[in-house]
From Swiss-Prot:
Methylates ribosomal protein L11. S-adenosyl-L-methionine binds at T160, G181, D203, N246. CDD domains: AdoMet_MTases. SUPFAM superfamilies: S-adenosyl-L-methionine-dependent methyltransferases (SSF53335). Belongs to the methyltransferase superfamily. PrmA family. Pfam families: PrmA. The gene is prmA. This is Ribosomal protein L11 methyltransferase. It is found in: Cytoplasm.
């Protein structure tokens, strides 16, 4: 299968709005190339300074690269995306640029390897690409071996990083966990590394489920995690201590009540994928359903909310 890569340059003020527009139309992830990074002295997570190629970044603003299945991307979709972006109140049309490039799936997989290197995603978790070797810094470090393939969730995005930190804080070995929209499976693997014995990973995309299963094998936990296709929690009859969902805000809104019903008493809902402009609506709806808000974390325009199921 081939993929259509959209390369869209916009001003910083609309970066998060455009990201949400692209994802709402079905983009399988968004890569961000920010011109501001060229003004910094790049240092990786291990303190090593490296050089950036200015040709990889726009002269102004930010370049968003989005990827669509070649069978779903068409002129109508292109027109709708263009219309919504150009309708944004803060859009700077003087730097706006929209380019298309058809990429073969094998090229896509190699593209990820150029950007993906070992890094510490949280206090305990280090993400290690499956094609690279890595030596742990200490015995407390938990390494997640990952090959994102055609699914997303590498740990470097603020939403995934915040979820990993929340998992460190709220998930106990005695808990049961259901990971909704598992993607690469990273959050399920993290839960397993903390000692959780019962984990279920759901994703509506069967390709993502297959990628997650491969990553579970790489981390020697494929027998410990049930990975299945699923549409949110609509047909879920089991109860869990923890529900994790790192997905888009409008999808989170759809599943809040089902999440409450899926949790046992005092269970936690860890959710991210929420932009700043939407988090208060999500928080209000969670409270209305019956959640007590335990934690709200902000990172670079994104928000992670942790709610606890309480009665009365």
């Amino acid at each position: 299968m081939n993929w259509m890569e959209l390369s869209i340059v916009v001003n910083h003020e609309v970066e998060y709005d455009v990201t949400e527009i692209l994802e709402s139309y079905g983009s399988n992830g968004v890569v961000i190339e920010d011109s501001n990074i060229l003004e910094e002295q790049p240092v990786d997570k291990f303190g090593e300074i490296y050089d950036l190629n200015p040709e990889d970044y726009p002269e102004k603003g930010v370049r968003l690269k989005a990827y669509f299945n070649e069978f779903t991307y068409n002129e109508n979709l292109k027109s709708n995306i263009n219309y919504e972006i150009l309708s944004l109140q803060q859009i700077d049309k003087t730097i706006y640029d929209y380019q298309e490039k058809l990429i073969a799936e094998v090229d896509w997989e190699n593209e990820w390897k150029n950007y993906f290197h070992p890094f510490r995603a949280s206090k305990q978790f280090t993400i290690v690409p499956s094609w690279e070797s890595y030596v742990k810094e200490n015995d407390n470090e938990l390494c997640i071996e990952l090959d994102p393939g055609m699914a997303f969730g590498t740990g470097d995005h603020p939403t995934t990083s915040m979820c990993l930190k929340a998992i460190e804080t709220f998930v106990k070995p005695t808990d049961s966990v259901i990971d909704v929209g598992t993607g690469s499976g990273i959050l399920s693997i993290a839960s397993h590394l903390l000692g959780v014995q019962r984990i279920k990973a759901l994703d509506i995309d069967e390709m993502a489920v297959n990628v997650a299963k491969e990553n579970f094998k790489k981390n020697h936990c494929d027998d410990a995690i049930e990975a299945v296709p699923g549409n949110l929690l609509k047909n879920e009859n089991e109860k869990f201590n923890i529900v994790i969902a790192n997905i888009l805000a409008h999808i989170i809104e759809e599943m809040i009540e089902d999440t409450y019903n899926t949790l046992i008493e005092d269970g936690y809902f860890i959710t991210s994928g929420i932009i700043e402009e939407k988090y208060q609506d999500i928080e209000s709806q969670m409270k209305r359903i019956g959640f007590k808000i335990i934690s709200v974390e902000h990172d670079n325009g994104w928000v992670c909310i942790v709610g606890q199921k309480v009665s009365g």
